[in-house]
Amino acid sequence: MKVLRLVNSAHFGLSRKIGSINQALVLLGMSELKKLVITSGIISVMPELPNMNIEDFWLGSFRTATYAKWLAEESKLENSEMLFTAGLISNLGNILIHLGNPVAAQEINKYIEAGDSRPDSERQQLGYTNQEVCAELCHRWQFSNDLIDAIDKSGEPLAFKPISLPACAIFVAKYISDFNNKDEEQFLADFPVKEWQQLGFNEQDIAEKVAIILDLDTGLEGLLD
Amino acid sequence: MKSEIHQLFNHIDNVPQVPEVVRTLVSQASNPNVSLMKLLKMLKKNKLFQ
């Protein structure tokens, strides 16, 4: 789980071993180093839960973060680094719901497995969504209002006016991140085209750009060892 | 905040607290004026980097 160990792992393919933060900064750059420290720090404070596969949870979060950053850069949004962090933590509300109300969390999962939408199931069982819970956690962590707003609206970005483009990026990133759970035909049929178009992309480019996104390497899996 | 969300947080024994270095790095993303030297100093002291 330590950043230095990951930096020295085969993934980064560095020709020599790094022993200090200054070396890491020179070889990786500040942006990459920040990503590793933020991700490692957030993983370190979140508990493991007996009824939740936490490794799958984090792998999904790594993908959402990486895809949200890519979408932000491609659509020329101002703050792609913020979108990485927002994507990374956008699902933490689910962990808090499991911690604070495990019975409702199990019920919500049953409704979703039966075909209901997550926002509807959460509102029915709890009166709020996991994104609202995550937004409150970010507020307590004193994160920026931009980040809190993006997460708060990321469950249903088109339901808010004006439409938040960062929220659209997180929503689309999360959808693509969950690709493993769907067959390709279903994936394209349910694709969030309106949110995609809000980001300035064309509907006919979905297959081509999604193939690029799915090829992105998060480079963060080593933080779970 | 909705009162129901407040209740949820009240039911969690230890609400996770984010490390100071993470808070600073996240806020730095939207504040380019944070000094690089200050960040380096903070990272050097932080056990996450060891």
Where does each model-flagged region fall?
Chain A
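Terminal helices and disordered tails flanking the catalytic cores of nucleotide-processing hydrolases
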Residues: V193-D225
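Post-HEXXH active-site segment of zinc metalloproteases
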Residues: P102-E113
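Juxtamembrane helix-loop transition sites at the ends of transmembrane segments
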Residues: P50, Y111-I112, I163, E195, ...
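Conserved alpha-helical "signature site"
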Residues: M1-L88, L92-V103, S117-D190
